[in-house]
Regions:
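Phosphate/anion-contacting hairpin/loop surfaces
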Residues: 1-147
Length: 147
């Protein structure tokens, strides 16, 4: 089984940032595994513009953004694919500063995916980027650990 960690390639692509003063944005960031669908109100995310020449020259042609851990934003075409393939995900509209059609991908529920016996083992896995998984993830296309 191949397991992939979703994160953004910040060295090559632009990305979206959330407004941390926006209550709705903070609620998504403070994920507890619950559904956010009922009562969802789209919040605004800002395209990172950059300050240096290198940052300003980052590629803006991307279909997903995951700058902040746990906040995955996907473009409409990718949202369509995910909605057909994945049962435990909500695709919730967000407002982008550059008027692109993006959604917040809320993975509903948390599972004990990582196999470790103590905090030290968990820290070693994090440092080495070599993870041991429980069998509970065998049939899941996308999941979020309870940590």
């Amino acid at each position: 089984m191949n397991v992939y960690l979703i994160r953004h390639d910040v060295d090559n692509f632009k990305f979206y940032l959330q407004d941390e003063s926006d209550f709705l944005s903070v609620a998504a960031f403070d994920f507890c595994g619950e559904s956010l669908f009922n009562g969802w109100k789209p919040y605004k995310i800002e395209l990172f513009k950059g300050k240096t020449k290198a940052e300003k020259s980052l590629n803006g042609d991307f279909n997903s953004s995951c700058f902040s851990p746990g906040l995955l934003y996907v473009e409409h075409s990718l949202a369509d694919v995910l909605s057909r393939q994945v049962n435990n995900i909500e695709l919730l509209k967000v407002i982008t500063s550059d008027d692109r059609d993006f959604y917040y991908a809320n993975v509903v529920g948390k599972i004990p995916a990582l196999h470790y016996n103590n905090r030290q083992e968990l820290q070693i896995m994090s440092r080495t980027q070599e993870y041991k998984f429980n069998n509970s993830i065998n049939e899941m296309l996308i999941f979020r650990d309870e940590i």
